[in-house]
Amino acid sequence: MICHRMNKYLVLNILSFFIIVTLCASCGSRKTAGGEQGDTLLMRHAQLLQMVDFGSYTEVSVQNPWHKGQLLHRYFLVKKGAEPDESSLRQRGTVVRVPLTHTVAFTTVHASLLQQLHAESALAGMADVEYVHSPSLKQLCKSGKIVNVGSSLSPDVERIIALQPDAMFLSPFDNSGGYGKVGELGVPVIECADYMESTALGRAEWIRFYGLLTGREHLADSIFRQVETNYQELCRKASQTKTRPTLLMDKLTGSVWYVPGGKSTLGSMLRDAAVSYVFADDTHAGSVALPFEKVLEQGSTATLWLLRYESPLLDTYTLQTLLSEYHGYARMKAFQHGQCYGCDTRSSLFYEEVPFRPDLLLSDFITLAHPELQLGSSRYFIRLPQ
């Protein structure tokens, strides 16, 4: 009887061991319909990306941020020189030969990202070049090494065709109806849905995808690890503060005030900065268009006001400049107490740097909201003079 029980326990232990091993193995691997075994690349923060390495190619699935559970795009990044069954892959998604060497970027964000990855030589064309602030990218555009393909909303298709790009970086939008003639060129479209991630580190982690596309995966991983470390250390410091100042963002554009949604990357960063954002309860992942009266209702008592502006003449932007744009700003407590801080997006690299270096912006938020931490001077925002 004792031997029988011992054998029973032995069998159960062996079965448990194999079940655990099988479960652990399945967490880091995946099989294709054809039986190929791949290694899942763990994404620690990004919710819209899944990447699986199959050796000769990497399968990248981009989830649809507007329709939960649906796929936006599936890519197969095939290393040059590798020979997988491309006809089979093309039936399941878009095949992209990597590393990319001749691309067109429709946003300054992704053009600047290629520069961060030391892959600017792969940038053949670019839209909206008038919004480029990086001196080196400006020079490449001026010299013609990067071709101006016009507006991102109405690009010069003939110029794009002449460039013969191996891929195009575009930002997708909900219900946009596709990419028009650009989407019909037969050139792989990289749908850059990173801006729809709900956290700053989630968006920043997309650098790993762009690293794979450009053959800079090791550099991309290194950059992201450093950003993640910096960001989390800043969060730790902010969480130890005792005050939670109320904060308002941005200002009117025409008759509409676009505020960061409570579920947007900026909204999440403000939470991480240990401030009480006046629209923290909002459920939108992007910007929200509001009339001034609604912002006044919720934000008039905010003690800190951070706003972004463009100064075409690079003149000093003051509280009086702000008031001349709209007299109603005088009703804001932060304005009355001189607690307004501005970022000139024309003269700074705000839009180029922040998407994939959120640690830099988080440092600004914490510096201004919690000066007692003595983090130093802010990088983007300065106090508006009288």
Tell what function each PLM region has.
Residues 279-281, 285-373, 377-385:
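C-terminal soluble interaction/assembly domains
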Residues 1-34:
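Bacterial Sec-dependent N-terminal signal peptides
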Residues 258-291:
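Alpha-helical, coiled-coil/dimerization segments enriched in small aliphatic residues
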Residues 67-161, 170-172:
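A short, structured surface patch at a secondary-structure boundary
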Residues 27-111, 219-247, 336, 349, ...:
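Bacterial Sec-exported substrate-binding components of ABC uptake systems
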Residues 119, 185-186, 273, 336:
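Short, structured coil segments at secondary-structure junctions
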Residues 145, 156, 166-256, 280-281, ...:
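Extracytoplasmic substrate-binding proteins
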Residues 149-173, 187, 292-305:
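Proline-aspartate-enriched helix->loop->beta-strand connector
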